[in-house]
Curated annotation (Swiss-Prot):
Organism: Solanum tuberosum
Ranges occupied by WD repeats: 63-93, 105-135, 154-185, 202-233, 246-276, 293-323, 339-369
Organism superkingdom: Eukaryota
Cellular component terms per the entry's GO annotation: cytoplasm; heterotrimeric G-protein complex
UniProt GO molecular function: signaling receptor complex adaptor activity
Quaternary structure and interacting proteins, as annotated: G proteins are composed of 3 units, alpha, beta and gamma.
Its job: Guanine nucleotide-binding proteins (G proteins) are involved as a modulator or transducer in various transmembrane signaling systems. The beta and gamma chains are required for the GTPase activity, for replacement of GDP by GTP, and for G protein-effector interaction.
Keyword set, alphabetical order: Repeat, Transducer, WD repeat
PROSITE patterns noted in UniProt: WD_REPEATS_1, WD_REPEATS_2, WD_REPEATS_REGION
InterPro entries attached to this UniProt entry: G-protein_beta_WD-40_rep, Gprotein_B, Guanine_nucleotide-bd_bsu, WD40/YVTN_repeat-like_dom_sf, WD40_repeat_CS, WD40_repeat_dom_sf, WD40_rpt
GO biological process, one term: G protein-coupled receptor signaling pathway
Name used for this protein in its record: Guanine nucleotide-binding protein subunit beta
Residue ranges of coiled coil: none
Length: 377
């Protein structure tokens, strides 16, 4: 069989798969008689309301000289680590806005960072295809450089996301442009498991984000440029447990719902979606109508501790607060006083849910606190 014939058969098979996938999508829509917001409205649920003082900017963290790409909170809620295009990690005291550490990175092209559960170490990764671990208690050398305590090497593409396994300083999961996710043993620096790659159930394009379930740390989800999200069990690396379809473009961010039974996704198609890991069904779409202009991409997301609110960052500088039950925007932090002046690249909620931190291409981070009559939701 010639190369041309093989190519023709491959194109025909691809078209068949796409046609079947579309039929499956339409059948699911027929069987799914309602979504979360439709059910909530029929039950007479009232929307969450926000006043002008219910979520206010209380701190501006200034110190980076380049675009902020990633941030993470410590479990004890009073420190934040941020990664920037300026090639530095900065650890901040969220209560005083003071810097406690400024770490110059061996590779300036950093894309992600994470705090260890104990708060004693930070991890970062980027275009060097490695994940670097820094012990914050290690002394700096004579040149003022903070030494790398462990280098996790093995990916064949950039490291797009990293997250420590909850309650463990010894294990971490990374996602990469090589279409895989990896579970690492930080103590040895070795890969424990590789998810995807040569396995047929893996992603078929760059993996951009991972999120580990806090209720079951053996489960994590990944989002990819192949427009899908996949559920993995760290005990079974050979195949994804489920594949979730619905987005029409890159899935930039994934985040588990607080109960661990659902997760959210955000995409370049401008929408966020809520999926159930037990049934595989899409429960809700969070999407603002736009005109004929460019649709802002979803860059980052976080749920409130109850799951009633969804905080979403967008490429145009907007930061919507969604009512997850009624699928309505209750506040746009991009239109209030002290809003960012550039793309919202990352955001995260403190462990107790009392504060939100946003990072932007305007080089700043901002901490937003609940005030007025609004308690933590």
């Amino acid at each position: 069989m010639s190369v041309a014939e093989l190519k023709e058969r491959h194109m025909a098979a691809t078209q068949t798969v796409n046609d079947l996938r579309e039929k499956l999508k339409q059948k699911r829509l027929q069987l799914l008689d309602t979504d979360v917001s439709g059910y909530a409205k029929r039950q007479g649920k009232s929307p969450v309301t926000f006043g002008p003082t219910d979520l206010v900017c209380c701190r501006i963290l200034q110190g980076h000289t380049g675009k902020v790409y990633s941030l993470d909170w410590t479990p004890e809620k009073n420190r934040i680590v941020s990664a920037s295009q300026d090639g530095r990690l900065i650890v901040w005291n969220a209560l005083t806005s003071q810097k406690t550490h400024a770490i110059k990175l061996p590779c300036a092209w950093v894309m992600t960072c994470a705090f260890s559960p104990s708060g004693q170490s930070v991890a970062c990764g980027g275009l060097d295809s490695a994940c670097s671990i820094f012990n914050l208690n290690s002394p700096i050398d004579k040149d003022g450089i903070h030494p790398v305590s462990r280098m996790l090497s093995g990916h064949k593409g950039y490291v797009s996301s990293c997250q420590y396994v909850p309650d463990e300083d010894t294990h971490l999961i990374t996602s990469s442009g090589d279409q895989t996710c990896v579970l690492w043993d930080i103590t040895t620096g070795l890969r424990t498991s590789v998810f995807g790659g040569e396995f047929q159930s893996g992603h078929t394009a760059d993996v951009l984000s991972v999120s580990i379930s806090s209720s079951n740390p053996k489960l994590f989800v990944s989002g990819s440029c192949d427009t899908t999200a996949r559920l993995w069990d760290t005990r079974v690396a050979s195949r994804a447990q489920r594949t979730f379809h619905g987005h029409e473009s890159d899935v930039n961010t994934v985040k588990f719902f607080p109960d661990g039974n659902r997760f959210g996704t955000g995409s370049d198609d401008g929408s966020c979606r809520l999926f159930d890991i037990r049934t595989g069904h899409q429960l809700q779409v969070y999407n603002q109508p736009h005109g004929d202009g460019d649709i802002p991409h979803v860059t980052s997301m976080a749920f409130s501790i109850s799951g009633r609110l969804l905080f979403v960052g967008y490429s145009n500088g907007d930061c919507y607060v969604w009512d997850t039950l009624l699928a309505k925007v209750v506040l746009n932090l991009g239109s209030v006083q002290n809003s960012h002046e550039g793309r919202i690249s990352c955001l995260g909620l403190s462990a107790d849910g009392s504060a939100l931190c946003t990072g932007s291409w305007d080089t700043n981070l901002k901490i937003w606190a609940f005030g007025g009559h609004r308690s933590v939701v």
